[in-house]
Amino acid sequence: MKFKIKLVMSRITMTVLSVLILISACTSGSKTGTNRQLPVYLDESKTIDERVEDIIPRLTLEEKVALCHAQSKFSSPGVQRLGIPELWMNDGPFGVRSEVLYNSWTKAETTNDSCTAFPALTVLASSWNMELASQYGQALSEEANYREKDVQLAPGVNIARTPLNGRNFEYMGEDPFLVSKIAVPYIKAIQDNGIAVCVKHFALNNQE
């Protein structure tokens, strides 16, 4: 039971961290024209820990629960009264996928629905080139920004253990040392461009 509680609180904290990044982007450089003091969670001069500690008590239980799950295929709800915007995610590791409708996998066919089909991560890893991994992440995040995404559901770091796994192409091979080396510059490049990353998968997908 304690583990479940800790897991839920961890998910809430990570979600709040993500929305604070969005709030920072929305409030950066803005001027209110008043002398009212910003709440701590909106104050970019405060540490992330301080901002998280300030905003969590402001959230109702219902709002905390809502932040922990999706409202559509690739978005989570915000909290309008606190200025927390919606969180828009993209899947996956080697490109910005085509848009789908809100609650179905039907193609949305929007006008900005364009992207580059980057080489699979297995190909990237086979280069053993850390600089190339950084350039890969940089290019991917540029397209994610263009498509107004907040979180990249990537990279895939599961270790290839069986050739029957239908998702091996999302991963970086069977060598955990190589995976750890390639994933880091990939992640940093995406984050440096203002996009959060969601490293996956937590469990079981080695055999999927």
Language-model-derived ranges and their functions:
Residues 1-9:
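N-terminal secretory signal peptides that target proteins for export/translocation
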Residues 25-208:
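Glycoside hydrolase catalytic-domain context in secreted enzymes
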Residues 13-24:
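Bacterial N-terminal signal peptides
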